[in-house]
Design a protein with these regions (language model features):
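Flexible loop/turn segments at secondary-structure boundaries
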Residues: 8-9, 172-175, 277
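C-terminal substrate-recognition regions of SAM-dependent nucleic acid methyltransferases
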Residues: 37-266
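Short, amphipathic C-terminal "tail helix"
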Residues: 268-287
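Conserved Class I SAM-dependent methyltransferase catalytic core
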Residues: 1-38, 50-52, 212
Length: 287
């Protein structure tokens, strides 16, 4: 049976189906196509496709094949669920990285990431183009506008704190390497955002925000987010596997590779999947 692969980690209304599938020890083989074009030329199905073999006489781990860019990785025989995980990690190379990270038993970033619509403002919100005294600067899908504090429906305590805004949607392409996340930028005191963004934080000051952004820029961090990403939506759930670091200083990939014991083979996998994140932040563009 060939089906969209969104059920691996997301998909509206698929929680019960995913739970049943991942606890079914009769799933003997899974063939995964992260990019549907590798199976059906010219067809784009967000999150890719998969087909599987269910064998009532089989009770045990599943043999997983990944088809990407004309090449097949696998089979790797492994459990469908890793410890502490309620979704399927689709990349065989990613399982060893995940296992190394969870050995550290660190709190993860979904604790400090907002749900959608962090200030209660929808994507259709458009404030005034010129600021009046006491207005809040609102980052929205057409740039920047201004609103009275009384017009901000929720989480008003975040307005006057340092935080990070990051787009709620990223590139819709399933081709790799991929950025996975949109570019983050600092939300200084006096700012809010529409549903176009989600919020990370709050943080003590601007320096801490800058250090968090160095972490988001790393390929390692975005690889961990990728394990939960099956559509272009970048929700709070993507940060479930991303450990919180010591943000009194910045981070680089080399620092993280050393901390978690990432091998050269795993680094090659990361480089093949994740694009560098470079360029001017949106905040800089609007200053």
């Amino acid at each position: 049976m060939i089906v969209p692969a969104r059920w691996f980690a997301g998909g509206k209304g698929l929680d019960a189906f995913r739970d049943e599938m991942l606890h079914d020890t009769s799933l003997r083989v899974i063939h995964d196509y992260p990019n549907a074009d590798d199976c059906f030329s010219g067809v784009q199905i967000k999150g890719g496709i998969t087909y599987f073999l269910w064998d009532r006489d089989h009770k045990g781990d599943c043999s997983v094949y990944t088809h990407q860019n004309g090449e097949i990785t696998g089979p790797v025989t492994r459990p469908l669920l890793e410890p502490g995980c309620d979704t399927f990690i689709r990349y065989n190379e990613g399982v060893t990285i995940y296992r190394k990270v969870i050995e550290h038993h660190e709190p993860t970033m979904e604790r400090i990431v907002s749900s959608r619509k962090p200030f209660g403002l929808s994507t259709t919100f458009h404030g005034r183009k010129t600021a009046q005294h006491g207005d809040v600067k609102v980052f929205e899908n057409q740039g920047v506008s201004y609103a009275r504090r009384s017009e901000i429906p929720s989480n008003t305590e975040l307005i006057d704190q340092y935080k990070i805004f990051i787009p709620r949607s990223s590139s819709g392409s399933d081709a790799f390497p991929h950025p996975i996340l949109g570019k983050p930028f600092i939300g200084k005191p006096g700012t809010a955002c529409s549903e176009t963004y989600i919020v990370i934080g709050p943080f003590e000051n601007e320096d801490v925000c800058k250090n968090v952004i160095t972490y988001i820029h790393t390929k390692f961090m975005r690889t961990l987010a990728m394990f939960k990403k099956v559509t272009q939506s970048t929700t709070k759930a993507l940060y479930t596997f991303v450990p919180i670091q010591d943000f009194t200083h910045g981070w680089t990939d080399s620092m993280l590779y050393e901390k978690y014991g990432i091998t050269d083979e795993e680094i090659t996998f990361i480089d093949s999947m994740i694009q560098p994140m470079e360029g001017e932040s949106k905040e800089d563009a609007y200053v």
